[in-house]
């Protein structure tokens, strides 16, 4: 099923609870805060929502019911989605398919999570190891960083510049976990986590929530919603790993999924104005930027240094601060990306605004095994 083979699908309301270090705040409060903000942003009542999908990874079973009943017990179908880091990206995809196929006119896609008691190496990524703790993702990406530096003949400062850019963006985002600018010296001088990777080159985990409302044309008209703020979802693509025969299978997975999503949307990579990608580690941004076709092979470090990926550059990458600064509470991360892309395409991102944004892309990888990519377009493009 291609999204554009069916009814047009739009994002009309967005909401977030700030991503933050673990607190005593209940997940219910986190989630309800985000959903209420999305409803207010859309200008609609909870009673208009016809179905809900919630992405989460660490909260147990049937998370949606005790959370959403605080908004009203309306009898709507609720589905919980777990797909590692791509959990709420997958929830959003399911919401889009519901609306596109005509099963519902208004669907909530949300994400919520709270940090659990895991070791520091696991906390850096939000992904629990499957080998008894002998290997954690930070080691994997440290090795990829070493290989990238060797193949590209560059030093550690090249990867550190990703963290500098994204912390600058995060400092302008009131929802971000990390809201402080960092210099190149601060990043390079920070505590090492694995290999050459420093703490500030690894995403923080914590807690938070995100929510978006997905609607049809019929819902916009019936509910009297503001069509000028409706951002269209042009494509929704999800793939799983194949036998790529490559050193970094998640890079190959990103390449194939992005190519498919752009083709379904009917646009080229060079038309993208804003991108939110899976930068759990700084090295990932360089790898995925090249895999997505946003620059040529081996060119990401040079274009980053030239400001091509900064806000105001050729294409703004991770203007929210990305996973490195916005944070990666896992469950909310994917829908949080959709919220940022929507804000950018509406021209409502304030000091983070990428000028004249028409097309945006959101990308997440789940445990290296699944990849979800969405392409969105501004109203009246």
Language-model regions, residue ranges each:
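Conserved catalytic cysteine-centered active-site region
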Residues: 4-7, 55-110, 114-128, 133-141, ...
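Short glycine/threonine-rich loop-to-helix capping motif typified by GTGT followed
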Residues: 58-69, 245-249, 279-302, 329-331, ...
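Condensing-enzyme catalytic core mediating Claisen C-C bond formation in acyl metabolism
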Residues: 1-25, 161, 192-256, 260, ...
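Active-site-proximal alpha-helical scaffold in enzymes
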Residues: 82-112, 138-172, 212-218, 326-349
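Extended C-terminal subregions enriched in glycine
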Residues: 259-282, 291, 323-326
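Beta-strand segments within the central parallel beta-sheet cores of soluble alpha/beta enzyme folds
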Residues: 11, 46-55, 77-83, 107-111, ...
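Conserved active-site "lid/cap" helical segment
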Residues: 1-86, 148-155, 178-183, 196, ...
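Short acidic, glycine/serine/threonine-rich loops at helix termini
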Residues: 23-24, 118-123, 171-175, 225, ...
